[in-house]
Amino acid sequence: MVSCGSGTACVLGNDEGYVHVGGTGLGGGTIRGLCKLLFNEDDPVKINSLSLNGDVTKVDHILSDVVSGPIGNLPKNSSAVNFGKGLSLEPNNSDLAAGVINMVAQTILRTAIMSAISSGVSEIVIIGRTPKYKLLTNILEEGFKLYNLNYEFVEGGEYAICLGTI
């Protein structure tokens, strides 16, 4: 299970119980905090809307910008340097929102994939409020497919933590 909240935790559950197998401090709190610092917006609904109109290639160097050929099975439009174009371009707020969400989503994705692989599982359940960012969900879906992992975004998953405490 990948719990995407303010940060992100990866938990392995089976008949014997639950164990924390990984995580990162990046999550929805990072998205809101960085967007507030970069362009003075911390409303998740507005950030989500902005990101869907943004172009991450305006802030990130992608693989085709920095290498001449393929790297494994990664798509050539994968980010190679998050915010690497920040020194040369002037992105708009939508591009910045897309860049922030992309960076957080990629970190969550890699953490989830490595946690799953190291635990020998191929099924991932995603809970939490952070997947409400549509761009983040799209990035996670693409990555899980690339690694042939089965995944499910739980409907009402933003309430899963609350239900688990009852």
Question: Where do the protein language model's features map onto the residues?
Answer:
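Glycine-rich phosphate-binding loops at beta-strand->alpha-helix junctions
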Residues: 114-117, 121-143, 157-158
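Generic secondary-structure signature for well-ordered alpha-helical cores
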Residues: 36-43, 52, 56, 88, ...
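Glycine-rich phosphate-binding/hydrolytic loop that grips phosphoryl groups
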Residues: 31-36, 43, 106, 149-166
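Short glycine-aspartate micro-motif
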Residues: 1-3, 23
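Short beta-strand scaffold segments in enzyme catalytic cores
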Residues: 7-13
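Glycine-rich phosphate-binding loop plus the immediately following alpha-helix
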Residues: 15-68
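Glycine- and other small-residue-rich loops at beta-strand/loop junctions that grip anionic moieties
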Residues: 23, 97, 101, 129, ...
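Adenine-nucleotide phosphate-binding core of ATP-dependent small-molecule kinases
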Residues: 72-123
